[in-house]
């Protein structure tokens, strides 16, 4: 029982260290990273699809996701385009160099 408890504690410490590294060195939050992962795994994705992904487990406010997406776009982690059929829809995606950049971030943490 003690061994299992120690492993859980160590896993939590490792997790906290990874989150701290993400914030300090990469200037990304956990939500930013999850958004990048969702976009990385999709050819293109809408904000609604992002919200229905892993972010549901974090109980993130939908209004904050737009801010996160704008920040990631300004930092050139992602690209976006507006649908020609429905201008309300914005699609987010990554080009090859952005995917490579994300892969490096994921590897570093």
Q: What do the PLM-derived regions correspond to, one by one?
A:
Residues 20-60:
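N-terminal helix-turn-helix DNA-binding core of bacterial DNA-binding proteins
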Residues 11-18, 53, 101, 108:
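Solvent-exposed, charged/polar functional surfaces in cytosolic regulatory/catalytic domains
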Residues 59-74:
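Short amphipathic alpha-helical interaction segments
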Residues 1-26, 30-33, 76-77:
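N-terminal leader segment of winged-helix/HTH proteins
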Residues 3, 26, 30, 60-63, ...:
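Residues at secondary-structure transition points
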Residues 48, 52, 70, 90:
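Residues within the helices of the helix-turn-helix
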């Amino acid at each position: 029982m003690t061994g299992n408890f120690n492993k859980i504690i160590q896993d939590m410490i490792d997790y906290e260290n990874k989150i701290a590294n993400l914030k300090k060195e990469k200037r990304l939050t956990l939500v930013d990273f999850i958004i990048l992962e969702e976009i990385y795994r999709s050819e293109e994705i809408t904000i609604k699809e992002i919200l229905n992904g892993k972010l549901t487990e974090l109980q993130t406010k939908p209004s904050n996701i737009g801010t996160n997406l704008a920040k990631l776009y300004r930092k050139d982690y992602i690209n976006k385009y507006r649908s020609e059929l429905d201008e309300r829809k914005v699609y987010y995606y990554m080009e090859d160099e952005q995917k490579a950049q994300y892969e490096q971030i994921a590897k570093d943490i």
